[in-house]
Amino acid sequence: MIHWEQSRTLLSFPQVGLHLSWYGIFFSLGIFLSSFAGIRLATVLCKDPNMRKELKTGLENFALGALLVIVIGARAFYVLFYGGSFYFENPSEIIKIWKGGLSSHGAIIALVIWSAAFSRFHIRRLPMLSVTYICDICGAVFGVAALLIRVGNFMNQEILGTPTSMPWGVVFANDSSLIARHPVQLYEGVSYLLLSLVLYWLCYRGSIRLGSGYSAAGALIGVASIRFCAEFFKTHQGSWLGEESLLTIGQWLSIPMVFLGIGILWIASKKREP
């Protein structure tokens, strides 16, 4: 059994009212490292040396916009699906993301939309920047960000797991029940990282071609499946569905992602047919 009493705040500057949380640091670091890995993967695999610099610049611009878009999408989904009536009664609280409340499903949807928009405005200059190309890169490198974000959740003592008698059960100081719980944040984060590493390796060695859609489809199906299973080890979240509901909000939101991934796989397979 592990007793976890880590403060949610990494650095505090009360003189200026600034408090840096573990979650915020890990979130930012994760996005940066995943972006770096994605740009590196794309430039290494680019066969035209004259295009590498321009491709690198384009993907750097994509990554900068993605950071903002991910936060907006993740917050919007949290407010809609997990906030219940609270945010409708207190709309000024919606912008206070430093208090917590981001949804990974919203982040994924926002990233796909941003990929489509970015591709539309840049594909004439860089024809390789198709929606599937960008999404394939994201699918191959998302794991670092996903892991660090879940580590941030663990450090913040949020998204608690169900009770367990296993020796690695964690007693969180902020949990009033003070009972050992599954460190489900780490289960989920490590699973995402392993999935992403497999996809990255397949892309790097050429088994999956960037732009084919296979990496994006694999990531969507894999992430949704991992999330669906992880929900069984989480305490109840959200207020739209009661604890007696057959599935959680997270599981319901994961189901369309599986079908979307299957649809992309089907389209990709049709393109390969002679």
Curated annotation (Swiss-Prot):
- Membrane association type: Multi-pass membrane protein
* Gene Ontology CC: one annotated term: plasma membrane
Any GO BP = lipoprotein biosynthetic process
Q: Which GO molecular function entries does the Swiss-Prot or TrEMBL record give?
A: phosphatidylglycerol-prolipoprotein diacylglyceryl transferase activity
Q: Where found, per UniProt?
A: Cell inner membrane
> What keywords were assigned to this record?
Cell inner membrane, Cell membrane, Membrane, Transferase, Transmembrane, Transmembrane helix
Name this polypeptide is given: Phosphatidylglycerol--prolipoprotein diacylglyceryl transferase
Q: Which family does it belong to?
A: Belongs to the Lgt family.
Using the UniProt record, give the first listed, main subcellular location.
membrane
Source organism of the structure: Chlamydia muridarum (strain MoPn / Nigg)
Q: Is the keyword Transferase in the record?
A: yes
Top-level enzyme category: transferase
Which residues are involved in binding a 1,2-diacyl-sn-glycero-3-phospho-(1'-sn-glycerol)? Answer: 150
Q: What is the lineage of its organism?
A: Bacteria, Pseudomonadati, Chlamydiota, Chlamydiia, Chlamydiales
